[in-house]
Amino acid sequence: MKKIKTIEKKYIVGVVLIFLGCLIVTSIIWGNRTFSVKTLNQIIFHLKVPMEGTDNGIYLDWFIWAVPISIVAGSLIVALIFNIHRLCKLNNEKISQSIKKHFIKGGILCIIISLIFAIYNYDIYGYINNVVQETDIYEKYYVDPSTAKISFNNGKRNIIHLYLESVENTYANTTFGGAEEINYIPELSQLAKNNINFSNNDNIGGSRTIDGTQWTIASQVSQNMGIPLKLSIKSQKYDNDTAFLPGGYSLGEVLEANGYINEFMCGSDANFGGTSNFYKQHGNYIIRDYNSFKENQETWQDK
């Protein structure tokens, strides 16, 4: 009886390990599909900032998508392990007993494979290499905006800076440098063609993104400060009372120093990802987000 219980525990542990290995892989694939950006810097950042305003449907989507696939994949792997000797036409009892004996090792192997996949997917090796590598790029090329002399010879004018979430040049057709046969952003393409367009090529190429500039708040920080948004694993939590990149100097601070009143507007919760902290601390922005619009009855539902 004791031996039977030991065998049962062995199988349970092995099955759980295999399932966890599958869940790690499917969760990574789900994350790539849902959020598109797959960098360790982004994960570290979002672990340290407020997640207020996150749609709870995201967690449900993960559960519905990742868990069933992991169960099916894990079941197939378990079935394959116990029947591999039959598939290979090696009807040997010793092979069958050996598989059962080392079943937990098979589960551990699944975990190892899933971790290797995670290392490759998030380029963890590249991240570690960048962390330990010394560079003098900032000493050589960074210009401190707080020391720059700014003149308003033609008078001061309002500045409107628009961010389009999840809009990229690939939506244009190949004529404009996009990736589609049909141009899905014809008006934006024409605006870029007829006006100043910052691009890395002769078409609507946009800028070359580097690590720490790809997700929403990272893009805003990099465009306002000229630096990527990167946090150390050892850095403190970025809550409402934490200084947000205290050494940086942004466009908002330049404007504030020259008498401008800054305002940031968005259709979501500005606390998400530390967005409101960034704008409040770097330019003393008035924050107007979905919550404030709702509170002041300014949404389209209130009209």
Regions found by a protein language model. Name each.
Residues H102, N121-K303:
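Soluble catalytic regions of membrane-associated enzymes that act on cell-envelope
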Residues M1-N130:
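Transmembrane and membrane-interface helices of multi-pass
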